[in-house]
Amino acid sequence: MFCTSGRSILSNSIVIFATLSSEPAIVLDRVSRLYGNFAALREVSLSLPAGASVVLLGENGAGKSTLLKIIAGLATPTYGTVSVFGGKPLEQRHRVATMSHATMLYDELTALENLRYFASLHADTALQALSPEQALRDVGLDPALPRRVGDYSQGMRQRASLARVLLTEPDLLLLDEPFSNLDRGSANSMVERLQKYLATPSAEGTRRTLLLTTHQPELARPLASLVLTLREGRIVDREELQLATHNS
């Protein structure tokens, strides 16, 4: 659990200190991202330990998705620096998985065929932790279902996308609106799967770290050890929570 917290001397900074890890999983120092004259992020500074489970709240355009992209190495900051597990984001991408609005699934393939393909991409890197069949079962999908992903409902596509990113059981999981298009039962099942992910240490024995964005905080709260609210590219509020599920 997080034992203490505080604000650093950096502008707009929220820094979380913990005994979970001697080295932070994520460090952002005065990160800004500009698109022309629009500032998607404004001098955001943040330090998170391995094992943190962070829910990002905020209206559309608040900077949530941009923040995830920068941590994932899919976008670069205009100003400031980013460190993931002590290195540059792209250097650590083998330890990170991202689920965004684009599912990254091939419509003409079944879910199992999709996951077998993604598993083959990691065949020589020893990254695959789950079988494609198990990854699908874990999110409530039948691996034997012959239907193409293109014929799936939005909720089924969302679950198949989650199975894809959990296939390697990454050290850092970044989820952008994972509960969108899910009914309450499917959303609760996803929460349970993510709780299992958080409670299972990596092969190296380190705690897994989660950041997710959502417009449905009531669904995400069971996962959260920290809730951050963004507004106009700045972190404006935080709420720290005690998470018994991390000890399960």
Predicted regions and their residues:
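Conserved ABC ATPase "signature" region
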Residues: 116, 120, 129-144
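Catalytic Walker B motif of ABC-type/P-loop ATPase nucleotide-binding domains
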Residues: 173-176
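Conserved ABC transporter NBD signature motif
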Residues: 80-92
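The feature captures the beta-strand-to-loop junction immediately N-terminal to the Walker
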Residues: 57-59
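Helix-to-loop junction immediately C-terminal to a conserved catalytic motif
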Residues: 72
